Amino acid sequence: KKIVFLLAFLCMLLLVGCSNGKETSKYNIEYLNKDKTGIVAVPYDASATTKDALIEEFFAALSSDPDNVEYRKPIPNDVEITKYSLDGALLTIYFDADYLNMKEVEEVLCRAAVVRTMTQISGIDCVSFYVDEKPLTDVNGKMVGTMYAESFVANPGEQINSIQNTNLTLY
């Protein structure tokens, strides 16, 4: 009986040690593509485990050049995150005044990359941006407000300029 039990235990131990070798990353860091016309999710293995440590680690990744030359960091060199605050599920990020020097398209992509990256952290559902201690406004002076990952439409492929024609029969 002891031998059968020991063999069964060893078999279970061997099965536990086996895996398919494919470990997927729990997180993605969103980078800009080479042309700065879209964002690309790149798998990322975080070393941090706490919420605050993950926030800091993601800020560092978003501000650093990626390993792949096909991607660009979303937060430019001259833009600095001065502080952040976490109030429930809302992460508020404070940038210095240099944030306003970004081109319009790059700024929107930066926001999308930061928001989509940060909302992957458990407990963070939305993000708000402040620039020079004031809420971020768009080109029309309207406050941008709270942003969610779903606030940014993903555009698969090159469909932004595509036009389709069709003939319809109306009755």
Residues covered by each model-derived region:
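Bimodal "functional hotspot" detector
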Residues: 3-7, 13, 18-171
